[in-house]
Amino acid sequence: MSITNEQILDAVAEMSVMQVVELIEAMEEKFGVTAAAAVVAGGAAGGDAAEEQSEFDVILTSAGANKVAVIKAVRGATGLGLKEAKGLVDSAPAPLKEGVDKAEAEALKAQLEEAGASVEVK
């Protein structure tokens, strides 16, 4: 008996943000791919002012009270080592990820806020 796409989607819908991030990382490792959005080349030089923003920067503004949990969340989200993640958290406000799509930016923001950090998406 095989699992249907609907069953997989239902299982993912019941997961926490942290569990989804861990699942994505495991899939990237197992299949040798990345979940990063493909960069599309070309387009108008000036762009359209009314065009919706497609790339976002996730900025850690404050570590909050639970600094250890925030460092763990930063490590999980960025793949940084312990020393690098601690340095980034200590230097807040600091950019965590730049040029990510809206879904990834919002997921990262939710994950870090769940750990106790203050996060801004620009």
Curated annotation (Swiss-Prot):
One of its GO terms (cellular component) is cytosolic large ribosomal subunit. The keyword Ribonucleoprotein applies. One of its GO terms (molecular function) is mRNA binding. GO terms for biological process: translation. The keyword Transcription regulation does not apply. InterPro entries: Ribosomal_bL12, Ribosomal_bL12_C, Ribosomal_bL12_C/ClpS-like, Ribosomal_bL12_oligo, Ribosomal_bL12_oligo_N_sf. Keywords: Ribonucleoprotein, Ribosomal protein. Homodimer. Part of the ribosomal stalk of the 50S ribosomal subunit. Forms a multimeric L10(L12)X complex, where L10 forms an elongated spine to which 2 to 4 L12 dimers bind in a sequential fashion. Binds GTP-bound translation factors. Belongs to the bacterial ribosomal protein bL12 family. Forms part of the ribosomal stalk which helps the ribosome interact with GTP-bound translation factors. Is thus essential for accurate translation. This is Large ribosomal subunit protein bL12. It comes from Aliivibrio fischeri (strain ATCC 700601 / ES114) (Vibrio fischeri). The gene is rplL.
